[in-house]
Amino acid sequence: MAVVWMQQNFQQLIEQLKGTLGKLGARKLIALGLVGAALMGAILYTSIYLGRPSYETLYVGLSRDDVNRMGLALGEAGIPFDVKSDGSSILVPIGKAENARMYLAEKGLPTSNNAGYELFDNMGSLGLTSFMQEITRVRALEGEIARTIQAIRGVKAARVHIVLAEKGSFRRGDQKPSASVVIRAEGGFSAESAQSIRQLVAAAVPSLDASSVTVLDTNGHLLASAGEGANGAALMTASLEQQVASHVDDSIRKALAPYLGLGHFQTSVQAALDTDRRQTKETTYDPESRVERSVRVVRESGDSRNNRNDNATGVEQNIPQEQIQNRNGESSTEKTDRREELTNYEVNSMTVSTVSDGYSIKRLSIAVVIDQARLLQTAGTTPPPANFVDQQITKIRDLVATAAGLNTNRGDVINVTAVNFLDSAGADMEPVSAPWTDTLLRQSGSYANALAILAAVGLLIWFGLRPLLRDQNVKPAGTEVAIREAGEVATPNFIGGAESVGEGVQAVIGGPAAYADQMKTSLSDLRQRMRMPAKLRLEQMIEMDEERVAAVLKQWIHETASGREADPAKASAMPELKAA
């Protein structure tokens, strides 16, 4: 039923629209179409052209000297320009950027104080000493290195000073080159970038060691200095620890976010790393895989006898030339036999040399703070079960330990606490709002578009919808006046004068050809028109022929001013005509 009702209403709406458009006539339809086309064109124009900024960027990231020189050049060329509040960007009117760039390129702008090898372009070979050529070469090298450093993210400007080694005939030791770099850094600059700058300068200058390069910023902060080998390693270790802690913290947040939701927990991770370099050499032997390589057998045998005759001590030994008989003596016999066997084996061996130049995690310290109110909401019941918070904290601790890769054997520590978060946290850290004038200037294009669209809609309503609504609005029957019989109603003479109000009504009915044809073809149409309010009929009279109505009004006013007796019908029609 609802669908049928909607279809009927839609059909009625279409019929009413067709009827309304049919009553307007060709002239009004053409005028309405022209007004609509003009409004659409105005809306399209405002959306395309008014939304475009009046100025476009010519160059960004310029130094103050370049901005001043480019401003003078553009002023001489008669090109309007503007400079942003940061003082490093130049704007020109839309459509003049190409001409401005060509003109500035002809003038050699923008330029920089860091001149490179183009110094040799305008240098003549005559009249130059070796000292001047060497100075120019050093200047060119400094300028080229400074340009390369400025290409690093976070470096706004750079200046390089290089001291090359001077050769001397009466010097015992060679002088080593050195360099210093001064940079103007932005927010994205880090300590690792300072070390990178040192390596860059050392690689660009012959025989220059990275430890002889000093890097500092325009605020006077020393970023890297000569002889800080240990400090450089410490900085790298600290940076590496921050990266590891950040990676572990991200892993914990990814694990807790689906469970608790963002903003209901806070994590903190501290990592201690071991970055010592180790070299290990290990040799392993396999006794089961021995192979007999050589066998050596040595055999020795011996047989020895020893006889010893000793005379007995007595008087006979003191008698000269007396043969003494050996009565006592010792004899011994020795026989030896020795065998020696030596077998050599080949045993498989494996030697492993390990050089560890990376890092290992010595200890992790993790702290997790959870919003207790949010934790109680996950219970689903009020009040929550007993020991619910402790059980949830245990689960979260296990989850965090798994996500972070905790190892209790190396002394890792984890602490999970549930507390009530403050609702006003961060209330005192509200961002400072920009001045309303800046906001108004930035949104001026949008405001112009909005005003143009509102004006177009207002014109469409005034010239398009208002006439339609005026034709549709008919006063109630209480405002209608009785129309006399057609034979008794006189018609006004629009050319020569006016007889009565009845004459005017008959002129409205029979004047235009369209109304006359309709009267002849349909009596019901005539009755319907006769029932129309007098004001509406008079408005139609004015729309059909304004000149005749104006002539009638002039004649009536002239008659009234001359003091002639006015016709009662004319007198009753005067307020209606004035209102129309």
UniProtKB/Swiss-Prot annotation:
Taxonomic lineage: Bacteria, Pseudomonadati, Pseudomonadota, Alphaproteobacteria, Hyphomicrobiales
Name of the protein described by the UniProt record: Flagellar M-ring protein
Region annotated Disordered, chain positions: 273-339
Transmembrane parts of this sequence: 29-49, 445-465
InterPro entries linked to this entry: AMP-bd_C_sf, Flag_M-ring_C, FlgMring_FliF, FliF_N_dom, YscJ/FliF
Keyword annotations of the record: Bacterial flagellum, Cell inner membrane, Cell membrane, Membrane, Transmembrane, Transmembrane helix
Induction of synthesis: Transiently expressed during the early exponential phase.
Organism: Brucella melitensis biotype 1 (strain ATCC 23456 / CCUG 17765 / NCTC 10094 / 16M)
Molecular function as annotated in GO: cytoskeletal motor activity
GO biological process: bacterial-type flagellum-dependent cell motility
Keyword Transmembrane applies: yes
Function field: The M ring may be actively involved in energy transduction. The flagellum is required to cause a persistent disease in a murine model of infection.
Disruption phenotype: A fliF mutant is attenuated in a murine model of infection. As the infection progresses, the number of cfu per spleen from mice infected with the mutant is significantly lower than the number from mice infected with the wild-type.
